[in-house]
């Protein structure tokens, strides 16, 4: 059937990962488990930082924000997929798709900027340890978060609102489990030159600048570590930034993997699987990277988890008293 321009559309179809109905319960259980692990892991990190005054430092301030972002980014995509699987309905409304695109761009862009701020924090901690508390003061930390928020809002609105000017064809199937900007643009019947220019411009500015900041920070860190006279000092410096560097490599490596997959393969299923590595896996793994490699975080988590039974008991007792 010939594709026709359709300026007003009501919904898109999210094809997801697997079409076999018999495998849908398995897929539902898998993604529900991954989502719960992501929420629980990042929530524990967030609550541990809030509850322990010893962790009220710039590094853990940024880490708690990263955990909150991971929760938000996962919640933007996975629950809709779970609802679609459970209801056996793969559709998403036009407004819902546009909203999902906007939030994915916002949270992913904000995480990108936050990783750059964390890299600068590690640079100051290793290269200027005596001036660390002076440089990384609460005002600067707040300004870095505010700048990241403003940058991410501009990026998300610029890229998502341009979809409003597009007309779409009759083929409205997205070969992913969530609405992704590049996939939606491929469905349009309109001229996408301006859209593609804006995408590359935004990638260079809003993506390239934070990445350049990360590379510059770690270049300075490497130079500083190599000049350290003692092996213990070098080991401490490497362990200080090891967790953050692992998350950076995972974040950008997953994004690069999705891009390479979309270029070298014509299979929508392979692209969909690669998108999982970018939109689900890093958010699930990040809490384990920081909790397993950080002694302070491990100690705080043990204390916090040990207090959970008593907190639950207090909550139950309070509930009974309230009912009385």
Curated annotation (Swiss-Prot):
Topology of the protein relative to the lipid bilayer: Multi-pass membrane protein
Membrane-spanning segments: 26-46, 55-75, 100-120, 140-160, 198-217, 238-258, 272-292
Disulphide-bridged cysteine pairs: 97-189
Compartments, record wording: Cell membrane
Positions in the Cytoplasmic compartment: 47-54, 121-139, 218-237, 293-324
Pfam families for this protein: 7tm_4
InterPro entries named among the record's database cross-references: GPCR_Rhodpsn (IPR000276), GPCR_Rhodpsn_7TM (IPR017452), Olfact_rcpt (IPR000725)
GO cellular component: plasma membrane
A GO biological-process term: signal transduction
Extracellular side: 1-25, 76-99, 161-197, 259-271
Glycosites: 5, 89
Record's keyword annotation contains Kinase: no
Keyword terms of this UniProt record: Cell membrane, Disulfide bond, G-protein coupled receptor, Glycoprotein, Membrane, Olfaction, Receptor, Sensory transduction, Transducer, Transmembrane, Transmembrane helix
GO molecular function list: G protein-coupled receptor activity; olfactory receptor activity
Described function: Odorant receptor.
Similarity comment: family membership: Belongs to the G-protein coupled receptor 1 family.
Protein name: Olfactory receptor 7G2
Organism: Homo sapiens
Gene transcribed to yield this protein: OR7G2
